[in-house]
């Protein structure tokens, strides 16, 4: 749904043959489109289509894809597009729970709060928080919100904190 980049981040971009759209159109089976990560047993990626149309997969189709994958996998993670447009609504349609990922910046936390409200309005009860790109030195200097600040504002359980790491940026850019 939306832009495709997880294949790049996982180093699987050269293995994409089919996408979720081909599964839905019947051009291929789910097993043909899933890319199994050889380094992580049990991890597979169903790539999104490489197009700009956030509405290319509707909520019923998302539900269908998740139903298919539920037969093989215990956990299915859906990387939602940023924002609160139709792509987001379509992506959350089959969700039982959600992990809201935000950076500790005022604008991002405000957006996360809005997303939490939308998740609750869509009857997703189990919502947790993952804080990404935390810079401890900036927090100490009062130039970035602390984990406690973000937790207090969003008032959902924290599942983890990922510190900023330049190595991740380098790795992502190199593939």
State what each model feature region is.
Residues 60, 64, 68-71, 75, ...:
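Conserved catalytic-core segment of NTP-binding enzymes
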């Amino acid at each position: 749904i939306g832009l495709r980049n997880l294949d790049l981040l996982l180093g699987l971009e050269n293995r994409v043959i089919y996408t979720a759209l081909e599964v839905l159109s019947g051009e291929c089976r789910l097993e043909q489109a899933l890319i199994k990560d050889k380094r992580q047993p049990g991890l597979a990626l169903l790539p999104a289509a490489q197009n700009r149309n956030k509405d290319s997969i509707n909520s019923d189709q998302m539900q269908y894809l998740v139903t298919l994958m539920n037969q093989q996998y215990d956990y299915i993670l859906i990387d939602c597009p940023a924002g609160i447009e139709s792509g987001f609504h379509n992506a959350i349609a089959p969700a039982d729970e959600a992990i809201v990922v935000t950076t500790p910046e005022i604008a991002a936390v405000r957006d996360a709060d809005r997303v939490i409200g939308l998740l609750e309005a869509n009857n997703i009860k189990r919502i947790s928080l993952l804080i990404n790109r935390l810079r401890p030195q900036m927090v100490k200097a009062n130039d970035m919100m602390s984990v406690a600040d973000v937790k207090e504002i969003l008032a959902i359980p924290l599942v983890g904190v990922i510190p900023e790491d330049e190595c991740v940026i380098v790795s992502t850019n190199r593939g």
